[in-house]
Amino acid sequence: KNVILMIGDGMSLMHMYSAWTANRGKLWLDNSQYTGLSKTYCANRLITDSGAGGTALATGHKTNYHMVGVDPEGKPLESLTTLANKKGLSSGIAVTCRLWDATPADFCCHNTDRDAEAEIVADYVNCGVDYVFGGGSKLFENRADGRDLFKELREKGYQTPRSWEELAKIQKGKVFCVTDTVDTPLPAERGDLLARASMKAIDLLGQNPEGFFLMVEGSQLDDYGHFNDIDLLMQETHDFDRTIGRIFEWAAQDGETLVVVTADHETGGLTLVDGDLNEGRIVCKFSTGGHSGVMVPVYAFGPGAENFTGIFENTDIFWKIKKLLNL
């Protein structure tokens, strides 16, 4: 009935195992029932980015590096959020980055260049997604083209809270929450905002008896992989894992929800070279400040989880979810 796709941006098996070690052998992710491996290469490069990598997950098509929600020729592709809405299901996204960043845009927008930020943000007005939570308010208002996208969203029937406190009060209806709190660079300052925003999405989207599709992204794992900052990377990874835990617990009680956890690519070429499990100590090395081409893990929990075993293309995740939701 429901599918929640959780994307750890830049997350690899090594990220999760390092986090497991740092947490003295405990992760919520350990409760996954089935696991697989996903090939992340894109249409024109072995090493992908979040534009092409996320587009594969969102639409089932490999596209060119830096493209968002379009095929290699630039033709717009339908995403899982769009297909869910067409079938009468609700849809949503919750991320800890600016909404013009590639992964959220892959599910809602269409552009041949992920850096065309103002154009990408304008696409959200007509995307039809029922719940959006993320950051990046500056491109929704005070734009060079004079448009007030918050006003346009309200005219489309959205409520537009600008903080968690405002969002928490909403009990029903379509929501487009842009709060710059998600852009706080330090995970400790952001707190459990991703978990709260995700559970709020479930509360609102779950009111639809037909079901829902929700994408949740731990966005800033990627940032600290690029920065080769293992301490903040582990903080982000543990924040994402705690969000996974909240969602796994809810899904276990619900009984009709599949949760799939994966990544769009790996960032940093992370290697765990030493450590101590009892002390929660890790010694890691990075091989790059960019992305690497390794396969990324896929974890699944709930009804239909058995479909996510083995080695498969990243695009297969889309097709498996589409089939399970009968989209």
Segment roles from a protein language model:
Residues A102-C108, T181-T184, S198-A201, Q207-R246:
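Active-site His/acidic residue clusters
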Residues K1-R143, L149-L167, E266-L327:
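N-terminal catalytic scaffold of extracellular/periplasmic and nuclease hydrolases
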Residues L57-Y65, K174-P187, D222-F227, Y299-P303:
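Gly-rich Lys/Arg/Thr-decorated short loops/hinges at beta-loop-alpha junctions or inter-strand turns
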Residues L5, V132, C177-T179, F213-E217, ...:
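Structural motif
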Residues L13, H238-L277:
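Metal-dependent active-site segment of extracytoplasmic phospho-/sulfohydrolases and closely related
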